[in-house]
Amino acid sequence: MKDIKNYILKLQDEIRYHAYLYHTLNSPKISDEKYDFLVIELQRLEKKCKYSVRFKDSPTQSVGSENLPEFKKFSHITPMLSLNNVFIKNDFLKFYKKIVNNITVEKIFFCSELKFDGVAINLIYINGLLFRAVTRGNGYEGEDVTSNVNMISSVPKKLIGIDIPETLEVRGEIFMLKSDFKKLNVRLTKFKKKLFSNSRNAASGSLRHKNAKVTELRSLTFYCYGCGYCSYENFTDSHFLRLKKLKSWGFPISDYNFLHSSYDEILRFYNFIQNERYFLNFNIDGIVIKVDSICLQKSLSTTSKAPRWAVAYKFSDKIKITTIMNILYQVGRTGVITPVAQVTPIYISGVLIKKVSLHNFNEIRRLNLNIGDSVFIKRSGDVIPHIIEVASKCKLQRNEDISIPKFCPECGSKLKVDSFSNIKIRCMAGLKCLSQFKKLLHYFCSKKGLNILGLGPKIIDKLVDLGYVSDLSDIFDLNVSLLTKVENIGIIKSQNIIRSINNSKNVSFSKFLCSLGIFEVGSIVARSISNYFFTLDKFMNSSKEEFLLINGIGVNIADNLYNFINDEFNKNIIFKLSKKLNISSDINAIIDNNNTLFRKKIVFSGSFSNFSRSKIIELSKKLGIIVVSSVSKSVDYIIIGKKPGRKLIKAKKFSIPGIYEKEFLNIINVYL
């Protein structure tokens, strides 16, 4: 219990510090999500130890932070409290049920609104004129920013309409539109000044600027969302109708304020806004739900920090907090070892997340990760989930360091540090490593490889485990009889797979090269190799120096290619595959090595009379001519058409010889 008490006190200090940075200095060091998590964690622990520890001065019982010394302090007419946050349906349901169960009214209405991501402001009007503008501060007194607020055009300086009260206290949010935020950072970049990390910081910094003219130039926007005090005796009891009245007096009000009378209605509004927010020109981080009746609000009252009659239902479907339980190591098809965090299962956007890739060991060091840490996981759209940052270090128990493995977790081979900058570790066993072999088979049969329909990763793994496939060439020895022995594969599916295998036997040289999964050799590099060698035999008998002559191949790829073709294990597989496949050249026309332009780099400039640009490029490639898109010193010729552009000017600077269209056509027509 003593350890927990000490941890609580430490957590209180940490939250106070970050609240001071956020509210007072306007210079937060952690994300809003991380701050919210720390507060929730503190609330949980305080509740657990409520009879043994005093929490009167805890940040869970206070609002905001102290004020900046540059601004004068003024008290609010009524306290300007913050809101309690909920992030999941169950917590919102608890709030809803507590309201409904504690009030003996036939029908309770709630006003659902947007939760703006800006700076809360309290405006005081005397006889319809703006008298003072004060920030939230600690909830009871804030900073006088009247001179700056006077520069914000959307804040009414004089109220319009009828029944204007003698004294009026209005609450709202000052924020920066997304479009204005972009313009501001462009302007700051131009003058080589520090950029704002987000629109909220930009709004807060602009509102608190010592020079009111700067505030005016920053184009801030104001929306009203409530009334703190009104001396008008006949003011309506409905918060929703009060907003309408405030609008008639000249206050800008959001178009997304709705009255709801059920949990389901509010939930539908939440889901709608969750999608709609991406189309808004300002940032929001959730919705706010308030009991509509002012009388009921008063009966429900408040805590020292927040009202009991309102809650902020924040968006958190894309970001969740979970705990790292273990670190696993996956071996890829090229032997790269990828650390994977095994986490406490959570749902994000309807998807159950159990594992999260850490990409490389440098990422572990960057995040300072340990087993037992609580982390923020983000998943946007269909993007693979990733860890944003550590939410909380494991403090109550000893956490384990994550060390770099020395041996392959699959085959036991000694691992090699492939890249010190990103700390990439590789297993050099190649296809002798079962995991690499399976992953290569997945790739070999995939759309990027030979595109064998029906042979997915699960079936391939079963075929390997049953001993039916022990190298790449065994795929082409499969038959219906063997396939039907595999679980969940019937005769029709087997026949379809065999048909697809037979279709894949006719393959281009570049496609074949790409399917082999040679490290750093993708479709573009494979095509360059194919255009240079034309045949598999020439490729298998080439030297490292010859690889370096190919466009787009540097020392690393040349080493990978040379090591691959000189490995006896690989040689044997290539030999077997060449006997079972019909590997055709990507160059369909007959190649004449006496062709002036054979294996020469050319670039086109201008338009051509006899062929379209795409057609003339296609013909050139068929003749073994290397076509590039831009001019560089390595280009051998520039082919000049009508109205050539800047490429010709650049080519002349490099003294690149030019060939006009007619002459070029005479050269290639001989071979067509």
UniProtKB/Swiss-Prot annotation:
Its cofactor is Mg(2+); Mn(2+). CDD domains: LIGANc. GO terms for molecular function: DNA ligase (NAD+) activity; metal ion binding. Zn(2+) binds at C408, C411, C427, C433. Keywords: DNA damage, DNA repair, DNA replication, Ligase, Magnesium, Manganese, Metal-binding, NAD, Zinc. InterPro entries: BRCT_dom, BRCT_dom_sf, DisA/LigA_HHH, DNA_ligase, DNA_ligase_AS, DNA_ligase_CS, DNAligase_adenylation, DNAligase_N. Its EC number is 6.5.1.2. Pfam families: BRCT, DNA_ligase_aden, DNA_ligase_OB, HHH_2, HHH_5, Nlig-Ia. PROSITE patterns: DNA_LIGASE_N1, DNA_LIGASE_N2. One of its GO terms (biological process) is DNA replication. Transmembrane segments: none annotated. It catalyses: NAD(+) + (deoxyribonucleotide)n-3'-hydroxyl + 5'-phospho-(deoxyribonucleotide)m = (deoxyribonucleotide)n+m + AMP + beta-nicotinamide D-nucleotide. DNA ligase that catalyzes the formation of phosphodiester linkages between 5'-phosphoryl and 3'-hydroxyl groups in double-stranded DNA using NAD as a coenzyme and as the energy source for the reaction. It is essential for DNA replication and repair of damaged DNA. NCBIfam families: dnlj (TIGR00575), PRK07956.1 (NF005932). This is DNA ligase. The gene is ligA.
